[in-house]
C-alpha cells in the first residue's frame, strides 16, 4: 500500500511541469510504432496511435501558451487525452491528469499529485500490483521517489517486469495466456511518462 508522503516534498513549478509534459509528448511521438506493436498482442495494435492523438492535441495547446497554474496545465492535459485519445487509454490517462489537476489546487507537491493520479487510475476499478497494467509502474515509481532511489533503469525494470504478469484487467484478460512474455503497452507508455519526469528535472535526488 502507498503510505502518506509528506516526508517527501518535491515541489513542482509550471515551467518544469510544462517541460515534463513536452518530453512525454516527444517520447510518444518517437515510440508510436513500438507502442502499437506491443498492443497488437491484445488486438487493435493502436495504443501508440491513440496516445499520439491526445499528445498532439496537448502539444498544440501548449504552443498557444497557458494562462494559469499547475492545476490548469494538468486539466488541459486531461481534456486532451479524454477528447482525442479515445478508448480505455484516453479515459485512464485523462483521469490521471484530471486527478493530478485537483491535487494541484491544494499544493504543488509531486507525491501528492502522483497519489491523486493513482486514484484516477483506480476510478475504473481496484487495480493491484502484478495485474499487467500501468499500476505495475506507477506504484513502485512512487515508492522509489519516496525513498530517493528512482532511476531510468528502475523505470525500465518495472515496465519490463510486466512481461511476467498475467493480465487480469480489461480485454487483455481474454487473451492473457497469449500475453505471457509481452510487455503491457499501458505500462510502457507510463514508463515514458516517468522517464520524462526524470529528464525534466521534476524529481531531484
Tell me what each language-model feature is:
Residues 2-205:
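N-terminal loops that bind phosphate or other acidic moieties
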Amino acid at each position: 500500500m502507498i503510505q502518506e508522503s509528506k516526508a517527501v516534498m518535491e515541489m513542482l513549478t509550471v515551467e518544469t511541469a510544462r517541460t515534463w509534459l513536452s518530453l512525454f509528448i516527444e517520447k510518444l511521438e518517437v515510440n508510436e510504432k513500438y507502442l502499437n506493436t506491443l498492443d497488437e498482442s491484445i488486438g487493435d495494435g493502436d495504443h501508440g496511435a491513440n496516445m499520439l492523438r491526445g499528445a498532439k492535441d496537448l502539444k498544440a495547446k501548449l504552443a498557444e501558451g497557458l494562462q494559469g497554474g499547475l492545476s490548469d496545465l494538468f486539466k488541459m492535459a486531461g481534456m486532451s487525452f479524454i477528447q482525442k485519445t479515445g478508448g480505455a487509454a484516453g479515459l485512464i490517462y485523462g483521469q490521471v491528469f484530471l486527478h493530478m489537476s485537483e491535487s494541484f489546487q491544494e499544493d504543488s507537491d509531486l507525491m501528492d499529485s502522483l497519489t491523486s493520479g493513482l486514484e484516477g487510475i483506480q476510478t475504473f476499478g481496484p487495480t493491484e500490483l502484478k495485474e499487467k497494467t500501468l499500476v505495475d509502474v506507477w506504484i513502485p515509481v512512487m515508492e522509489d521517489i519516496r525513498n530517493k532511489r528512482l532511476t531510468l533503469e528502475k523505470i525500465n525494470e518495472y515496465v519490463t517486469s510486466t512481461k511476467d504478469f498475467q493480465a487480469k484487467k480489461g480485454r487483455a484478460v481474454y487473451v492473457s495466456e497469449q500475453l505471457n512474455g509481452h510487455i503491457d503497452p499501458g505500462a510502457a507508455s507510463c514508463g515514458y511518462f516517468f522517464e520524462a519526469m526524470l529528464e525534466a528535472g521534476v524529481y531531484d535526488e
